[in-house]
């Protein structure tokens, strides 16, 4: 509602629960749209994108890491497609910021969205939106019918060093401290490397367990794990109640088939050790099993 309006036509990657939210938002705000409907965990391809070339789209919306499945979409292909078709690229990077390399200039990202609660490891409550030059011009010239999410109003207040309403001050202070911590620990590249190593360590060590990683294009922040012959919600519950370990359940059709393991925040290799040990124990007890 700040960047697009009824005169636009946007294309949305919808491969899970968070892609669907972009669809819902466009429907709510009467923004003409079409969706690239992908199977759960499926990556985007050039062949898929080419079907939508030269069709008058003005914007492209994507959750670059679809958190519900863990798939990390091919940003190079998307960026090239948007550049070729003169489309504004909006990237929800909430689950990929500080976990995968992202560069607004290199990747031709016009609107970059993230939040306080993922790899920044602060409490939820702050949304961070970065606008490129083209997006800034859009915001300045667009009429936004919103009291609390009017970016033009926020930008105008920013020029006087203020916000239009009281922000979550304590979370801003925590973000400031967290950014200093990341800088002191070697910077953004070191943080991405640390998270990548945690993710790869976990993925290698579950290969001898009755678990599968079906997604072929993975980001570093989260791994979607399928239980071969166990119910995922049973495993999630056992880990929580018996081992004091919290992993992420899934809802919907895959709720009993899949759970997710995060690799961001203050997690360490020692946390991986505890989780792997618990999963092996569940296997020994016949709760996590190869056969029915």
Predicted segments — roles?
Residues 4-18:
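Conserved PLP-anchoring active-site segment centered on the Schiff-base-forming lysine
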Residues 43-98, 111:
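Active-site phosphate-binding strand-loop segment of PLP-dependent enzymes
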Residues 105-117:
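Conserved active-site segment immediately N-terminal to the catalytic lysine
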Residues 117-201:
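Active-site C-terminal subdomain of aminotransferase-like
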Residues 211-242:
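Conserved PLP-binding catalytic core of the aspartate aminotransferase-like
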Residues 242-260:
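Conserved PLP cofactor-binding pocket of PLP-dependent enzymes
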Residues 257-292:
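PLP-dependent enzyme catalytic core of the Aspartate aminotransferase-like
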């Amino acid at each position: 509602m700040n960047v697009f309006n009824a005169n636009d036509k946007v294309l949305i990657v919808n491969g899970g629960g968070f892609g669907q939210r972009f669809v819902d938002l466009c429907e709510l705000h009467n923004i003409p749209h079409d969706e690239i409907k992908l199977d759960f965990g499926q990556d985007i391809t050039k062949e898929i994108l080419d079907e939508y070339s030269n069709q008058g789209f003005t914007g492209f919306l994507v959750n670059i890491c679809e958190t519900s499945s863990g798939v990390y979409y091919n940003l190079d292909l998307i960026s090239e497609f948007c550049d070729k078709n003169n489309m504004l690229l909006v990237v929800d990077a909430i689950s990929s910021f500080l976990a995968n390399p992202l560069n607004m200039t290199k990747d031709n990202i016009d609107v970059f969205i993230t939040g306080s609660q993922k790899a920044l490891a602060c409490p939820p409550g702050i949304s961070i939106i970065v606008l490129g030059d083209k997006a800034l011009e859009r915001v300045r010239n667009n009429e936004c019918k919103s009291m609390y999410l009017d970016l033009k109003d926020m930008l105008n207040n920013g020029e006087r060093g203020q916000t239009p309403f009281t922000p979550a001050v304590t979370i801003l202070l925590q973000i400031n401290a967290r950014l200093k911590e990341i800088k002191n620990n070697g910077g953004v590249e070191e943080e991405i490397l640390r998270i990548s190593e945690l993710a790869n360590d976990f993925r290698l060590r579950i290969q001898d367990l009755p678990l599968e990683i079906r997604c072929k294009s993975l980001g570093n922040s989260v791994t979607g794990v399928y239980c071969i012959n166990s119910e995922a919600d049973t495993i999630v519950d056992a880990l929580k109640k018996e081992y004091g370990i919290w992993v992420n359940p899934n809802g919907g059709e895959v709720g009993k088939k899949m759970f997710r393991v995060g690799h961001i925040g203050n997690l360490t290799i020692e946390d991986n050790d505890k989780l792997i040990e618990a999963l092996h124990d569940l296997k020994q007890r016949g709760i996590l099993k190869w056969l029915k």
